[in-house]
Amino acid sequence: MITELPDTTTKAIAAELAHARERHSLATGRVLTLLVAIDDSREDSIDETLATLRDASFEHPARVLVLISGDSEADTRLDAQVLVATDAGASEVVVMRLYGELTGHMGAVVTPLLLPDTPVVACWPQKAPKHPAGTQLGRIAQRRITNLRRGTNGVTLKQLTDGYEHGDSDMMWSRITPWRGIVASALDRHPGTRVHSAEIAGAAGDPSVDLAAGWLASSLGVDVTRCE
């Protein structure tokens, strides 16, 4: 079920969430609040993000607050959609489009909608900030997730590393998990063998290759060279 709330307030959104739980007898066992910041307002991009969140919700039911930054020069307005039941998987999703001064006050917008006594996770599936923990959403969240590989604003792995704080992670780490498992298994087969150096190769321009190289260097204590 999708409920449209044009030119609304966070109080009205919270009331609609409560009414939706009553109407649909929804379970309240949400394990976290997930904040998702999107700058791209294309509907196909939003639909792709919502589909991913819906699939993930069956393992991790959450309250998902999606924030889409609109025109900061427009009149201040908050438009929202509340998605529950089949349209939200096992979660409850609020899609909020921010205009005017609200684009610079994301933290204030989401605060009244946070679930009590549950962790808060912030995610930037498109444009990764250089210092996630320094953003308004990042200061609220205990965990911060970026997706540098799909970044569209030119932030590099080096910049993300320089701005790292405890609780930051990037989706690249999950992507290289199978590869790390294979490497660790191969090294375990020869426990007495000393590694003096390593070379790593991968797709040109893919930052996950540099992340894998850093993991090798840290784990083995040797110099690692990236081969193009």
Predicted regions located by residue number:
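A generic structural motif
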Residues: R63-S72, C123-P125, N147-G151, D223-E228
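A broad structural signal for short, well-ordered beta-strand segments within beta-sheet-rich domains
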Residues: V31, A90-S91, D117, I140-Q142, ...
